[in-house]
Regions:
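Histidine-centered divalent-metal-coordination microenvironment in nucleic-acid enzymes
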Residues: 243-251
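A hydrophobic, small-residue-rich beta->alpha segment in the mid-to-C-terminal subdomain
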Residues: 252-295
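Short, low-complexity, disordered segments immediately C-terminal to signal peptides
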Residues: 45-62
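Long, positively charged binding patches that form subdomain-scale interaction surfaces
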Residues: 167-232, 239-241
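N-terminal low-complexity or amphipathic/hydrophobic leaders
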Residues: 83-147
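N-terminal secretory signal peptides that target proteins for export/translocation
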Residues: 1-23
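C-terminal motif of bacterial Sec signal peptides marking the signal peptidase cleavage site
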Residues: 39-40
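A glycine-rich, hydrophobic loop/mini-helix early in the fold
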Residues: 129-176
Length: 320
């Protein structure tokens, strides 16, 4: 009987060795593929999602101005653009686009390029309240010189028997929430018996200090209006960097009214709030920022700007 190569002992040994080598090479290739896939997954952009109406973190619909980005932001982080003393001293040129700002949160307050009105960010949408009271959606390319945002979770709630005044609201929330050395984001939806708001008109270079510009603000009072208070509370130790205490903006449900809140009163309401444990400050990369004296104590002037109200109110803003 003829003997084939496979029947020879030396051939069997060679075949066994070849099989081991082949298996080793297959294992090596598989390992390399797994490593490559793992690296690809780790480098894929993270997507910050907007909470859906049912409370899940489903991605927002296509085309919506929402907080989607490649930046991973802690849910309890406050992010601010520039510092308040720079804005007080007239640094009004926008440095961050609204699209980029939304990477850091879907809730907040601020202003727009050249101090063009009040900025309100609610549910990932941006609203610009102009100096004449009209309200526009903020374009992704619009820039801000100062803003404060956070991803809003509505983690905690506090029932309010009434809102007697803005001062009452501040004091009541401080007592109920506590955490005096941390940042708080607050959202309150209610029907307001009365509310007084302000906005400022767009400025042109050379810019005047905010304390001067605020004297020319437009002020409106409206009764029986339903809408949302958007508030950021900063601890007192941020003086010079942000606004110590509460910074309130308001937006009516029908978008007919909005602005920086000076006074308000309402019946019972529910305050939803987040306690923020992290704080990120993005400094200005703009001409003049490194030479301006930010060490000045502008707190008294800031308090006047935040609460100032002209005796003569402007004509009520037009309804949309």
């Amino acid at each position: 009987m003829a003997i084939t190569d496979f029947d020879r002992p030396e051939a069997t040994s060679q075949l066994t060795t070849s099989g081991l080598v082949l298996r080793w090479m297959q294992s090596l290739v598989t390992s390399l593929l797994l490593l490559a896939l793992g690296a690809g997954c780790s480098q894929a952009p993270a997507v910050a999602t907007q909470p859906a109406a049912n409370g899940s973190n489903a991605p927002a619909e296509n085309g919506a101005q929402t907080a989607t980005s490649s930046v991973s932001v802690p849910r309890d982080q406050i992010t601010q653009i520039s510092v308040i003393n720079a804005l007080m001293l007239g640094h009004y040129d926008g440095i961050t686009t609204f699209e980029e700002l939304l990477r850091y949160g879907d809730f907040g307050v601020g202003t727009l390029n050249q101090l063009d009105g009040e900025l309100i960010i609610l549910d990932g949408q941006g609203y610009q309240v102009h100096g004449d009271g009209t309200i526009d959606r903020v374009a992704p390319s619009a820039k801000t010189p100062f803003a404060v945002v956070t991803p809003f979770d509505r983690a905690e709630q506090q029932k309010l028997p009434q809102i007697e005044s803005l001062e009452w609201l501040d004091d009541h929330l401080d007592e109920a929430i506590g955490h005096p050395n941390k940042f708080i984001a607050v959202r309150i939806h209610a029907n307001f018996a009365t509310i007084t708001l302000r906005s400022v008109k767009v400025q042109s270079p050379p810019y005047r200090p905010l304390g001067v510009v605020a004297k020319e603000q437009s002020v409106w009072t409206r009764e029986n209006v339903t809408g949302t208070l958007i508030g950021i509370r900063c601890p007192k130790w941020v003086q010079g960097l942000n606004v110590p205490g509460y910074h309130w903006h308001f937006l009516a449900d029908d978008l007919s009214l909005g602005g920086h809140v000076l006074k308000c009163a309402a019946g019972s309401a529910l305050a939803e709030y987040d306690v923020c444990q992290e704080w990120l400050v993005r400094l200005v990369d703009a001409p003049g920022f490194d030479t301006v004296n930010l060490n000045q104590d502008l707190n008294r002037e800031l308090r006047r700007v935040e609460s100032a109200r002209d005796d003569e109110e402007s004509e009520a803003p037009p309804n949309k």
